[in-house]
Regions:
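NAD(P)-dependent Rossmann-like dehydrogenase/reductase catalytic/cofactor-binding core
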Residues: 2-132
Length: 132
């Protein structure tokens, strides 16, 4: 799913009228064209050793801490923004949508970033804002 979402990000980058050539595919960055290769590569990176998913202790064990920045920023801002950009350029991003739906199914609807809150209502508004 990560690689599929990364492919969708790369498709978005190619569609936008900005120089986004520096946005590398994860597969290129980690030199890993498959999920298996990516898993092996990432699990072997020393800097990632000891990193855990945010959890909180409950009776009988641990559960994900959906109030941590990891979840609130990455989903409610990062993924939501990418999906909104895809809507502006009419690109289907089913893997991003599936991931966001999974998150919503777990935590319910939450306040999320919306371009319209900042006066960005159209594709042209988006381009103008980021061309400043």
């Amino acid at each position: 799913l990560l690689i599929a979402c990364d492919t969708e990000v790369q498709q978005l980058c190619k569609t936008l009228p900005f120089n986004l050539s520096y946005v590398k595919s994860l597969c290129v960055h980690y030199e890993s064209p498959t999920a298996e290769a990516m898993t092996k590569k990432i699990s072997g990176i020393t800097g990632f050793k000891g990193l855990t998913s945010p959890t909180k202790k409950v009776e009988g064990g641990y559960i994900p801490d959906f109030n941590s920045r990891y979840f609130t920023a990455d989903f409610s801002y990062g993924l939501v923004i990418l999906i909104q950009i895809a809507e502006y350029v009419n690109i289907d991003v089913p893997n991003m949508r599936e991931t966001l739906q999974w998150y919503h199914d777990l935590v319910g609807e939450r306040k999320e970033y919306n371009f319209k809150d900042y006066g960005i209502n159209t594709y042209q508004d988006f381009v103008d804002f980021y061309s400043l």
